[in-house]
């Protein structure tokens, strides 16, 4: 479950680069995670926008610092500076626009030139649109480069969190890592009577401080 940015000095944070041609839905995808709303019309990204997205996992809370880069060619000279110290990436194309798929090799080569061996996910967005031009049988680039591939839709939540989960597992080196509900969401699901009983009981108990350790294997960036 993704949550908006919350201040936490000790929170494990990983720089995620999201790249692809303009209009593929990168910003809409991130804002969908951030706000829960689907924005039909978003302004083109100018340079880069950064969105901190928090997820609760079975090993603790983590944050992806998502660098949403501009897809327009006029900003191409700035890409290398944005990519420095990237730890994982998503390459997005639009299944309704053939040229965005044809350009993914350029985005891949740019990432590899700066970030070397970081885990990368390829995402085909807008699968909810009936008039798609790139069918599943046409998508083969990920097999050539040994990338994980997901067909997704920011509009109807198809494979909504899978790119983040895959990248979290790769960075953690833990194939069993899973996303869980936030503690806040679990409390909201309690009925009123149970919540009142817990509140009364808590008032009679001494305060205990606990600490959850969380260790991730970070990738070395050459």
UniProtKB/Swiss-Prot annotation:
Can you say what this protein is called?
GTP-binding nuclear protein Ran-4
The UniProt entry's coiled-coil ranges are none
- The record lists GTP as bound by 21-28, 71, 125-128, 153-155
Location relative to the cell: Nucleus
Organism name: Arabidopsis thaliana (Mouse-ear cress)
Q: Which PANTHER family does the UniProt entry name for this protein?
A: GTP-BINDING NUCLEAR PROTEIN RAN-4, RAN GTPASE
Q: Where is the Small GTPase Ran-type domain?
A: 10-174
GO cellular component terms, alphabetically, are: nucleus
Q: Name the Gene Ontology biological process terms.
A: nucleocytoplasmic transport; protein transport
Q: Which SUPFAM superfamilies match?
A: P-loop containing nucleoside triphosphate hydrolases (SSF52540)
Q: Which family does it belong to?
A: Belongs to the small GTPase superfamily. Ran family.
User: Does the keyword GTP-binding feature in the UniProt annotation?
Assistant: yes
Q: What does this protein do?
A: GTP-binding protein involved in nucleocytoplasmic transport. Required for the import of protein into the nucleus and also for RNA export. Involved in chromatin condensation and control of cell cycle.
Stretch list, region Switch-II: 71-87
Subunit structure and binding partners: Found in a nuclear export complex with RanGTP, exportin and pre-miRNA.
Tell me the lineage of the source organism: Eukaryota, Viridiplantae, Streptophyta, Embryophyta, Tracheophyta
Residue ranges of the region described as Switch-I = 40-48
The record's section on InterPro entries has: P-loop_NTPase, Ran_GTPase, Small_GTP-bd, Small_GTPase
A molecular function (GO) term? GTP binding
Task: Show the stretches that span the lipid bilayer.
Answer: none
Q: Which UniProt keywords apply?
A: GTP-binding, Nucleotide-binding, Nucleus, Protein transport, Transport
SMART domains the UniProt entry points to: RAB, RAN, RAS, RHO
């Amino acid at each position: 479950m993704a949550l908006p940015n919350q201040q936490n000095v000790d929170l494990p944070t990983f720089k995620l680069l999201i790249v692809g041609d303009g209009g593929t839905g990168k910003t809409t995808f991130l804002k969908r995670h951030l706000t829960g709303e689907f924005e039909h019309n978003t302004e083109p990204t100018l340079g880069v926008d950064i969105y901190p997205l928090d997820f609760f996992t079975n090993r603790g809370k983590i944050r992806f610092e998502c660098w949403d880069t501009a897809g327009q060619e006029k900003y191409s000279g700035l890409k290398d500076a944005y990519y420095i110290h990237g730890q994982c990436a998503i390459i997005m194309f639009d299944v309704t626009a053939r040229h965005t798929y044809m350009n993914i090799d350029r985005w891949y080569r740019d990432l590899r030139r700066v970030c070397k061996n970081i885990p990368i996910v390829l995402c085909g967005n807008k699968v909810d649109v009936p008039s798609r031009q790139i069918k599943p049988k046409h998508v083969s680039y990920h097999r050539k480069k040994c990338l994980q591939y997901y067909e997704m839709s920011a509009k109807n939540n198809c494979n909504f969190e899978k790119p983040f989960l895959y990248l979290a597992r790769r960075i953690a080196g833990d194939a069993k890592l899973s996303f869980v509900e936030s503690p806040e969401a679990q409390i909201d699901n309690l009925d009123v009577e149970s919540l009142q009983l817990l509140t009364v009981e808590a008032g009679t108990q001494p305060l205990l401080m606990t600490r959850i350790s969380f260790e991730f294997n970070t990738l070395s960036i050459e």
